[in-house]
């Protein structure tokens, strides 16, 4: 069976770190308030010259280097982002150009915080179908540029960053993407959204969120989709070595783990240092755990996320 195997990971963060204490100097909040409600202590904010595509390119370079291949080997680039450099062209094509990659398939996917899972699923399908051999899948965001910095209920939650994986088609063996599951429910599109856009206000807009409603749906949906994808893979929750979740809020991570009966020590947590980086959060957390040695070859991983729309999804991967 032809499978998409993860052969390299990479990540990138802006130069500037912003602690809760620094944020509290300009926003009506405090370190204690943020930590108690979210678990977040730090985030990274893009500065001059740093964009979604530059962060994506840096993460991609590291993933390609880790994979031990040349950029020219990449035949497919999918970039998940809700904060592209421009309305068009796709930021994936900017990454392609920056990496010096010639003719290939390159496009963006937009499913907000679950965008990386959507992009991974598409890449997996294309590899299984034979239309790609090496794929670069990236999640990258600069949410700092769509935040209302006077709204303490949202601006404290988000950060900027990028994460990337290189997938390679391999025949036989038990490594690779075992199963993916995706969902969307547009009835809830006004619970987490940006109040602007080219065809409506002709502005970028600012992020708006009804936090308690999002929390309630997130815990239920994430637990559900994790069970679904494990069933699709013919495995159980007990088989999981590591869950790599979307890093939205420490309380969501803890509540989801409890609902599934998962020990907290099997959940990769980076939200304290990176905050919510939307589509970047899953590949960013994955890269951190690969590079610090927690995730090892042969481990069974479940990646999961939920974002605005609502959209949500999960992937079971034998690393």
UniProtKB/Swiss-Prot annotation:
EC number(s) per entry: 2.3.1.180
Intracellular or extracellular location(s): Cytoplasm
Active site (catalytic residues): 113, 246, 276
Any single biological process term in GO: fatty acid biosynthetic process
Alphabetically ordered keywords of this record: Acyltransferase, Cytoplasm, Fatty acid biosynthesis, Fatty acid metabolism, Lipid biosynthesis, Lipid metabolism, Multifunctional enzyme, Transferase
A GO cellular component entry from the record: cytoplasm
Family listed: Belongs to the thiolase-like superfamily. FabH family.
The protein's name in its UniProt record: Beta-ketoacyl-[acyl-carrier-protein] synthase III
Organism: Rhizorhabdus wittichii (strain DSM 6014 / CCUG 31198 / JCM 15750 / NBRC 105917 / EY 4224 / RW1)
UniProt gene name: fabH
